[in-house]
Amino acid sequence: MNKNTWIIGFTLFAMFFGAGNLIFPPNLGLESGQYFWPSILAFALTGIGLPLLGVIVGALDKQGYIGSLNKISPKFSIIFLIIIYLTIGPLFAIPRTASTSFEMTVTPIANTNSNLALFIFTVIYFLIVLYLCINPSRMVDRIGSLLTPLLLITILAMIVKGFVDYGSNSHSQATDAFTSNFSGFSQGFTNGYLTMDAIAAIAFSMIVVNAVKATGVTHANKIFKQTLMAGIIAAVALMFIYISLGYIGNHMAVSQEKIASLTANDQNIGTYLLTTMASVGFGTFGKYLLGIIVALACLTTACGLVVAVSEYFHRIFPRISYKIYVIIFTLISFILANQGLNSVITMSVPVLSIVYPIAITSVLLILLARFVPTKPIAQQIPVAIVSIVSILSMIHTQGWIKLSFIDSLPLKSYSLEWFPIAIVTTIIGYIVAAMVKKQKPIVYEKE
């Protein structure tokens, strides 16, 4: 591995080391109890492995996922990318940055979680976002480049102190959702959806590919290998942090009365665990410092997402100006952020339960076609069937329409019913492709 590989690896790490995602591992650790290891490893699979795989697969075509998804279907490519940008933008990810910032700063410092306090905070937060995005400058990037190492140092200090403070404690008791190693795995797997990093990787993979090209690597195979090695570096670093935070959360003593109180006050348990770690480890100053760093890091993330989503929509629908998109997406994010962190997370679950299976299936199909060439129909069949099953399963799970056959699907009780279907339909797709003579084989464009 050369110097550039390490640089790109830590660039990848910085992209996925989001302040907003730090709340999930401790919460999973607390809830998983004796099933911690299968839960956290499954979380790492969807929260780290899939995002990095997504970036690596994005390097297969010179146009990134725009080119790769177009091979499946141009209409599917546009619709799916729009859904992804809305998901990682104004519908869920951007509002979550604001509500997380609120619960990491105002709630522990002012000891309030009121709707009025949240409203005032989000007004100020999104006015700053609006100003910085309408008048984009390098300032946000510079602040972000300073905050990432500062946040990393703070988290590492918390981890070391957390092991000292909680490492000798017995593990927590698993909640009702965790009844076996396999249920722990499935819970961790679907909890990893909440990071939204795998679908973000589809949107931003070209940033990494261009960073690799900037080092002088231009051959397609070398770009793929360089991105793969950089991805391994980022994965190891992220796994250490997520597993460590999860392990500490797994050994924190939180009474049922406290959990009931947090739930009654609509306060997120993950943010409570993080602020408690900081407070116990470093006192009031540590709690305040962590909150401020996380809030600023979330702010820079929000700015980056608003700019990226606005630029994307302006590119595909140019009649509306970039600034109008910024205003629209900032306003939507402001409205949704005022529902509170738990509500934002809850609202995202049905959408992510549809988007993630489609995204995972698409990424794996693109990767498979790289090594086992085929025709578009081989990808179209599994993507279409997985999309239909995921939508119907979500409708059934939410109780909107009862579809009894959904419960009989393999792995439905673990929210993985789409996976065997993806495997079977991929095999069928390849068989059909071998019989179809009119379609040309998929060829990913290289430099």
Swiss-Prot record:
Membrane-spanning segments: 6-26, 40-60, 74-94, 116-136, 143-163, 192-212, 228-248, 289-309, 324-344, 349-369, 381-401, 416-436
Membrane topology: Multi-pass membrane protein
Gene Ontology MF term list: L-isoleucine transmembrane transporter activity; L-leucine transmembrane transporter activity; L-valine transmembrane transporter activity
Cellular component GO terms, alphabetical: plasma membrane
Compartments where found: Cell membrane
Cited InterPro entries: Brnchd-chn_aa_trnsp_Livcs (IPR004685)
Family as reported in the entry's similarity comment: Belongs to the branched chain amino acid transporter family.
Task performed by this protein: Component of the transport system for branched-chain amino acids (leucine, isoleucine and valine), which is coupled to a proton motive force.
NCBIfam families: livcs
Protein name in UniProt: Putative branched-chain amino acid carrier protein SSP1343
